[in-house]
Amino acid sequence: MSEEEKPKPKLSPALAAKMAAMKKKQEGGEEAAASQEGGEKPKAKLSPMMAARMAAKKSGDASPAPDKPKAEPVDENRDPEPHEMAYRVIKEKFGDAVSDLDNNPLMPFFTVENVDAWQAIAFFMREDERLRFDYMACLSGVDYGDGRLGVVYNFDALATHKHKLTVKVFCSKEDPRIPSVAEIWLTADWHEREAYDMYGIVFEGHPDMRRILCPDDWDGYPLRKDYKVQEVYHGIKVPY
């Protein structure tokens, strides 16, 4: 009995259907390859957004810029938010030493207008029963590029009131000094050292005011806008 005369094994319906689908897919691939050889390449399907952009570009019309979200109007009769109540307590105590509250939705803050009062304000923020800002979450140095340096402090009252508030303190680049709050919030210790290392801000009263990332004899402060990398450090070329 020849190979052709041998009975072929009977396939299960599921396997037969699977093999038929594979054969159909293979035939479709061969047809696609043949059409490509003939110069017909399949076109990529564009997303609706990309198709609209291409149509606008073709017609010479620029896509309109999306409207910026408008700030919600402030309801003067509403109950104050927790951070607003906290600010009012601070403002009542220190008056003109602090600015008005910038009540933006992302990071409401006030500015310390009298830098000499900053330690007293900080201590009050931590100790007053109505405030209890027991956690300094972050401290960030900033070079504003107009002769001013500054520090942005983010505070939380984790144990009690659950409110948050941000404080900004400025100093001049010629005399960059701000009172330290490292003995009020322990987390400020290394944060202040980093701000000193990167911006040259001296935190007066800090227990260990020295660089924390760069070598002690490094030239300049790397995050200032006018910083220029030194070319050689102890005979070693500085890569940049």
From Swiss-Prot:
SUPFAM superfamilies: Nqo5-like. One of its GO terms (cellular component) is plasma membrane. NDH-1 shuttles electrons from NADH, via FMN and iron-sulfur (Fe-S) centers, to quinones in the respiratory chain. The immediate electron acceptor for the enzyme in this species is believed to be a menaquinone. Couples the redox reaction to proton translocation (for every two electrons transferred, four hydrogen ions are translocated across the cytoplasmic membrane), and thus conserves the redox energy in a proton gradient. Belongs to the complex I 30 kDa subunit family. Residues 11-20 have a biased composition (Low complexity). Its EC number is 7.1.1.-. HAMAP family: NDH1_NuoC. Residues 67-82 have a biased composition (Basic and acidic residues). This is NADH-quinone oxidoreductase subunit C. It catalyses: a quinone + NADH + 5 H(+)(in) = a quinol + NAD(+) + 4 H(+)(out). The gene is nuoC. It is found in: Cell inner membrane. One of its GO terms (molecular function) is NADH dehydrogenase (ubiquinone) activity. It comes from the Bacteria. It is a peripheral membrane protein. It comes from Chloroherpeton thalassium (strain ATCC 35110 / GB-78). InterPro entries: NADH_DH_suC, NADH_quin_OxRdtase_su_C/D-like, NADH_UbQ_OxRdtase_30kDa_su, NADH_UbQ_OxRdtase_CS. PROSITE patterns: COMPLEX1_30K. Residues 1-82 are annotated as: Disordered. The lineage of its organism: Bacteria, Pseudomonadati, Chlorobiota, Chlorobiia, Chlorobiales.
